[in-house]
Amino acid sequence: TQKDLGAVSRRYLSADGSRVFAAVKYPGQVAHIVSIARGDGRVTELKEVKGASGYTVTSLAYDPATATLFYTTNNNTHRNLEALDLRSGRSRMLLRAARIGDIVYNPADRSLWGLRLNNGFVMVVRIPFPYDGWQTLYVFPGDHKAFDLDLSPDGTLASMSVTAPGPKPGSPPVTQVRILRTDALAKGDTTPLHAFTMGAAVPEGFVFSQDGRYLYGSSYYTGVSNIYRYELSTETLAAVSNAAIGFFRPLPLDGSQLIVLRYAAKGFVPTLIEAQPTEDLSAISFLGEQLAAKYPEVQGWVAATPSTIPYQPRVRRSGAYRPAGELSLESLIPVVEGYKNSVGVGGSARLGDPMGYDSLGVDASYSPDHALPAKQRLHLAANFHHTRWTAGAAWNGADFYDLFGPTKRSLAGYNGYVGYNLPLIFDPPQTLDFLAKVAYYGGLDTLPGYQNVTSPSKNLFTADAGFVGLDTRASPGAVDAETGHTWSLNAHAYGAAGDLIPSLTGTFDVGLPLPLNHSSVWLRSGASVSAGAHANPLANSYLGGFGNNYVDSGGNGGAQRYRDLLSMPGFNLDALPGKSLLKLMLEWCLPPLRFEALGSPGLYVSWARPELFVGALETDLNSRASRRSAQDIGAQIDFQLLVMHRQPMMLSAGVARGFAAGGLGTTEFMLSLQVL
């Protein structure tokens, strides 16, 4: 190939021998199934692999008769099995959440074989055509782990590596390559015809040759990964390479040639070698081995196994665990908070249970500012989290980040709320949550969420219910999502003075990766419509500004707040009202800039993330008299800071220019340090 391929799956030779099929995860690009031309090394992307795994990317199998590639998605959770038709380019789902990997195609009966992991047990399964279900052939004991399944070209033999406990108690596990008859394995008989080990080294990626006479694989037997050949008829094992850096995952061709993966700095590189047995192998020396030989006493520095430590004397009590009854004080600290334009001082207490299921936070502060009414100088807030439920209450709620404006979250009066979060789909990278919240406010002077809008009523009831969906992916080394989509749909209602004003809001964002590493283009869209009279503040949404404070928290929306539906950089906060709205934003995420040594060990910058965006907004679409158009264009750059190697922070700088009739547009500058 003309470039390094990054991580690479198992590879297959096309029926005519002109191409090699594999799944790759390039540096800076999302994972794809690709076709590699053997003539010129040209790489053609065929299909994105969602939920790719680390070094193996996906489990891949090939049916040359029907030109079909079988592959797995969501490899880090409950694997799906999908099929890609190479003729049409279309992919279809075969088995969802099947948890089957190490798949291999059996040309004898068109079945797929694989290894399924469930509840800690590995089982050999067979997936007969048309691949709508599986049959369990054998379940390994819990202390056995099988991997690297393969079938001979005629389908009569199966090979796999099996890691099992050592021969003596406490001895290290041993990995053995086993060759079995498939007809016996189909009946649950796992007696091997042949078996071999490679000492303490782990054999990896052993596959059958095209004539079925040999198995080729790799192992760190000498400390460097080399290719080895096992001959079934003589049961002899021989090295066929002597690499300086390492060869991996051989693909046997006709005769004695192999396509192997050579290790390089940016990933694996396909390399052609001749498989000639050799005894000229160079071993490398390990510092740990030399240290143990020089100082034999270190060989006894072995941590005891958990089973040898008696835990019964440490049990204080037994029975059902009730998180709320286990709450205890975790922290009690002094705090400074902002309330509108005043400063309050007080304390904050945090309680939690040892397992982290429940938490309770209580904040209290006092603002000695005589410019405030006396009843607004005391600030109290409490919030409680229990599994999917949250509840809270506040009196003149204050916020630390209000000290650093321009966005203010403090509210006069009292309020209480109850929230609920139910995960409907949790299959990363795909998630779907149902969210609901009801709240009541009393003694208001401004509308919650809109600091520059006077509330038409002192007392206000709000209710929200909706869904949030996420399906985004990123390449290795990414600093942000690079492809995929997100969406949300939320129903909202205000209740005040006997009136109920409902509204409906939806968003949809879709991103596409660019050939430039770690670069993508996103189209972000949103719309909202509300009932009620246009003159009623409760019937309107209000947009404007970046929304970041000079010092801020990720809990308030993250650094990239310009992406929010109600953000509109280049305009003042809440400057653009609308009873209905339609908003589009086009965003280009540029490749990050990485710094090798910018800063000191205690505080340094690891990367910078530049972004460009342009947006357009239409409000009150169904009213000619009040319809308004606004546009903006801007840029933001985020610097990832690390403090004491452990605490990440984000320093963001942005600028935007707004355009709208009536002189509402401004040039807005933003500087924000996200500390948590």
Spans of features found by a protein language model:
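Short coil/turn segments that connect the beta-strands within blades of beta-propeller domains
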Residues: D16-S18, A65-A67, A108-R110, D154-T156, ...
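Short loop/turn segments that connect beta-strands within beta-propeller blades
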Residues: A37-G41, D85-G89, P128-D132, T182-A186, ...
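Conserved blade-ending motifs and adjacent loop-strand segments that build the rim/top face
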Residues: H194-G205, T236-D254, G288-E289
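Solvent-exposed loop/turn segments connecting transmembrane beta-strands
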Residues: V336-V345, G352-G356, A364-L378, S410, ...
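C-terminal outer-membrane beta-barrel translocator/porin domains of Gram-negative envelope proteins
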Residues: W395-N396, P406, G419, T446-V614, ...
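Transmembrane beta-strand segments that form the barrel wall of outer-membrane beta-barrel proteins
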Residues: G319-N341, V345-H370, A391-D399, L403-G405, ...
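A flexible loop/linker signature enriched in serine peptidases of the S9 family
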Residues: K3-G6, A23-V34, V49-T56, A65, ...
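Outer-membrane beta-barrel initiation region
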Residues: T1-R10, S14, V24, F268-V269, ...
